[in-house]
């Protein structure tokens, strides 16, 4: 679900935290990607011309494999080294959000069934996309594909986005990539959004710098987390009637979520606290996430196993052999020499004095002669 309204608040108060660029601008970078999030995107976006998911002859869905294979190759071709991080067990507090998602899927199934044969292709497709979920089998297939491609993947003990942020904080990668804005609660130096979107969607990649974001909001780490909880996150529901502007204002006025809760309890306000609202437990999950220390994780990119890819993707999953071989060659070429250095890795940026430096007298005379 992410955090409602956080994106807009940061754009409003911390515009310098945002940058937009194309995939090629990330050349020379290593990036930790929330695998479950991008698999979900692939299952929704990678479709046949009739709107149905890709399948093999046995009727097994292959949209997730197609998306993972070709988008990863595109990154490697742009000299980007991806590492995919998979979710572990969900926190107990997330059970409520997961239950809501299940109920939404059940409702979508009822609405789709009610359409019968009278629904348009667009209507049926709308409900089918709401029914999408990433299965355990699809996760395992994605891991197998990545292994054959020579791309590292990490099994997080808990939340994938928290582990992505840990890898970024620990210097193993440049940034964490996820569509969930709550990734920022785990303090990655940079958050990348839309990284795994298809180029056909023509959406630039968004980069959000964590330090600039909280500096623009003029908040501490703790206040930022409290703001995210107040806006509504996966771990607990929001307070009815409190939107992004009000949430920001309340944090500024009261300083913490504890003080806001006390203010609501002790004063006649239009706000009602949810029953047994676990805001402090949610805060602890953001403050002390269950992750594997970055220093304990070794990331290695290897040459693809072409024979293994042919066996899995062509013989088992029904993909074109020519396309898989072509993709494997692109992987070999992209991964062969390692990550090339970026220019900003060779040059130190030095701030110049704001005052205009005095012109060299010789330069001044020369320039005057040229003008004559």
Swiss-Prot record:
Domain of life: Eukaryota
InterPro entries cross-referenced by the UniProt entry: 5-3_exonuclease_C_sf, Flap_endonuc, HhH2, PIN-like_dom_sf, XPG-I_dom, XPG/Rad2, XPG_CS, XPG_DNA_repair_N
N-domain, as annotated region: 1-105
Keyword rRNA-binding: no
Binding residues annotated for Mg(2+) 1, in chain numbering: 34, 87, 159, 161
Class of this enzyme: hydrolase
Family membership: Belongs to the XPG/RAD2 endonuclease family. FEN1 subfamily.
Organism: Candida albicans (strain WO-1)
Cofactor section: Mg(2+)
Name by which UniProt lists this protein: Flap endonuclease 1
Entry-linked CDD domains: H3TH_FEN1-Euk (cd09907), PIN_FEN1 (cd09867)
């Amino acid at each position: 679900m992410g955090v409602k309204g956080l994106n807009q608040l940061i754009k409003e108060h911390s515009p310098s935290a945002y940058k937009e660029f194309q995939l090629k601008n990330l050349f020379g970078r290593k990036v930790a990607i929330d695998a479950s999030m991008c698999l979900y995107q692939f299952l929704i976006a990678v479709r046949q011309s009739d709107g149905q998911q890709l399948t093999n002859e046995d009727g097994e869905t292959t949209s997730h494999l197609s998306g993972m294979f070709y988008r990863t190759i595109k990154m490697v071709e742009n000299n980007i080294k991806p590492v995919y991080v998979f979710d572990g067990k969900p926190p107990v507090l997330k059970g409520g959000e997961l239950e809501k998602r299940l109920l939404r899927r059940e409702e979508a199934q009822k609405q789709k069934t009610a359409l019968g044969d009278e629904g348009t292709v667009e209507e049926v497709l709308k409900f089918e996309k709401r029914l999408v979920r990433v299965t355990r089998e699809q996760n395992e297939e994605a891991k197998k594909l990545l292994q054959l491609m020579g791309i590292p993947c990490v099994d997080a003990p808990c939340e994938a986005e928290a582990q992505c942020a840990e890898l970024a904080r620990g210097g193993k990668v440049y940034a964490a990539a996820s569509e969930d804005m709550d990734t920022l609660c785990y303090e990655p130096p940079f958050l990348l959004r839309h990284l795994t979107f298809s180029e056909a969607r023509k959406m630039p990649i968004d980069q959000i710098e964590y330090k600039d974001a909280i500096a623009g909001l003029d908040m501490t780490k703790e206040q930022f987390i409290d703001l995210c909880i107040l806006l509504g996150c996966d771990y607990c529901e929001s307070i009815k009637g409190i939107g992004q502007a009000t949430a920001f204002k309340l944090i500024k006025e009261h300083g913490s979520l504890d003080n806001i809760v006390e203010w609501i309890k002790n004063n006649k306000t239009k706000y009602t606290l949810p029953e047994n609202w676990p805001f402090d437990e949610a805060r602890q999950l953001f403050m002390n996430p269950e992750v594997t220390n970055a220093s304990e994780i070794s990331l290695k990119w290897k040459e693809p196993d072409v024979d293994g890819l042919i066996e899995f993707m062509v013989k088992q999953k029904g993909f074109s052999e020519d396309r898989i071989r072509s993709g494997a060659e692109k992987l070999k070429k992209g991964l062969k020499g390692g990550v090339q250095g970026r220019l900003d890795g060779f040059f130190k940026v030095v701030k110049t004095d704001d005052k205009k430096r005095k012109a060299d007298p010789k330069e001044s005379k020369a320039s005057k002669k040229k003008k004559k």
